[in-house]
């Protein structure tokens, strides 16, 4: 009976610690109601208008919530497009005290993204670069704790290999437009290499990988 009471006490202490740490994390988030209202209005005003390689609002919310939950502060986006995903990412980073580096090779998309970031009130949280990600990603020093890859699928694996050493343990690497073969997805070697990438990341023992609709989410558990 004494052992049972002791075990119950330990469990209660552990649960209390988890709850307390969760409350502390929530308190640590930066509160900016005016910015939140501005971003929400921007997203509402532009709902259904995002085209040109942008993600859905659902996927944007997924990225936002991952960053908040992990308290991530150093983010990289490969493939800005016109900025929809970057807005969701930067919005979360505005709450954690972080900053986003985002890169796109297309000058017109880059220009439009800059305007969208400004209108959403998030420019100060974003370092948007017009560059070839094939070269820039290799040059970036990091470290990063969050990555969103949404560029050329046949380069997905190369991007991952280049960033992996720069991703912190506990960090999250997300990739867009990935589907499980069992769900009628791309399969090995299909759709420009995304199938090969999917199989590669799933095989890594130091990553825990799951699929949320079309977003592959990989958490780094250890260096090797």
Regions found by a protein language model. Give the residues of each.
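A short alpha-helical cap/connector motif
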Residues: 4-5, 20-146, 153-224
């Amino acid at each position: 009976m004494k052992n049972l009471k002791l075990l119950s006490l330990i469990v209660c202490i552990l649960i209390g610690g988890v709850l307390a740490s969760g409350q502390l994390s929530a308190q640590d988030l930066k509160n900016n109601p005016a910015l939140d209202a501005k971003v929400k209005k921007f997203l509402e005003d532009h709902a259904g208008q995002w085209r040109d390689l942008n993600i859905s609002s659902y996927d944007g919310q997924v990225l936002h919530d991952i960053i908040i939950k992990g308290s991530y502060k150093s983010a990289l986006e490969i493939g800005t497009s016109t900025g929809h995903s970057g807005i969701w990412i930067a919005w979360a980073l505005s709450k954690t005290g972080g900053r986003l580096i985002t890169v796109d090779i297309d000058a017109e998309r880059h220009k439009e993204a800059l305007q969208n970031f400004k209108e959403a009130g998030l420019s100060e949280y974003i370092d948007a670069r017009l560059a070839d990600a094939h070269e820039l990603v290799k040059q970036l020093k990091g470290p990063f704790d969050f990555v969103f890859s949404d560029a050329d699928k046949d380069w997905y694996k190369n991007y991952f290999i280049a960033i992996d050493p720069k991703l912190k343990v506990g960090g999250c690497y997300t990739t867009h437009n990935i589907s499980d073969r069992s769900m009628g997805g791309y399969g090995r070697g299909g759709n420009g290499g995304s199938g090969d990438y999917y199989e590669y990341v799933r095989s890594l023992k130091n990553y825990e990988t799951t699929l949320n609709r079309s977003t592959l989410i990989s958490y780094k558990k250890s260096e090797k």
